[in-house]
Amino acid sequence: MTDVPTSAPRSTSKSEFSHETVLLFETVAAVLGEKSLNDNTPKHDGNYVDATFGRGGHSKLLLNYLSDDAKLFVFDKDPEAIDVANDLAAEDKRVIVVHDSFADMTQCLNSRGVSQVDGIMADLGVSSPQLDDGSRGFSFMRDGAIDMRMDTSRGQSVGEWLQTVDEETLADVLYDFGEERHSRRIARAIKGMTQYTSTLELAEVIKQAHPKWQKGKHPATQSFQAMRIFINNELGDIDSFLAQSLTLLAPQGQLAVISFHSLEDRRIKQFLQRHSRGQYPEDENLPMPPQRPRYFSKPKRIAPSKAEVTVNNRSRSAWLRVATRTDTPYNTDPSPQHS
């Protein structure tokens, strides 16, 4: 067996920015349906998906536990991530690179002759290289164009959007996607800017407009998060991704998803609850109330270890949610099924 790394792999990106993979061993073990990883962990056959390749930390470790006949489909919208993925695919024929959103996972897999997979993993949100590279516009600590697009080859940047959006809509975005309580005040200040070209200038305007700063947290944190989530349709993509897992995962297939803030985690939690509890209608007059099918079992949430948080501070807000697909075929009819 190939030696397993004892720490998260460093990025092999052509850029100078590195990335420490969060919940590395826990995620790979979960997507394989293993309690832990060691030298006795068997090689797994089948098809697997890394829905957010990034710099490939999870994928590289997972490949150590896949058989020669297995396939790993890696998705990402970011052209820089795709460059890294293509380098990996050139070295390992089991890797198939898909430059697309995980929201289009089913279509992309079907076009490649794949209708079901044995495991799906995703690491949501923005990556360390994206944050550390000021030119991408994600960071309020480094200067750059106000971009924030995951895929820089298409779509409108945040800076372009800010030029045309009205104050009320901007305030709604800051509140809905950043849970920013002072959204109206901040939106008014942002719309008072004469140009939208510098992330540091934008961050300073937000900072000055914010009436109450939380200790240890930059006042622009939630506003930058909100604009990034909105411009990339991140929550809509997550909803689509989760829904597709119902039909893509084979019986006993594994779903493992890492999130970094409450808006993401709440969606994943509610999705797994809805499809694992077999909810009953509220009708006490029924002698044997109909039950909805259970499409997932054993949902659980895993936090990073204290040791990982000490080494990688960015992991402190991460949560990994995992679940196992049941044998029940997915029924698109919303009416309850009788037991």
Residue ranges and their predicted role:
Residues 1-339:
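S-adenosyl-L-methionine-dependent methyltransferase catalytic core, i.e., the SAM/SAH-binding region
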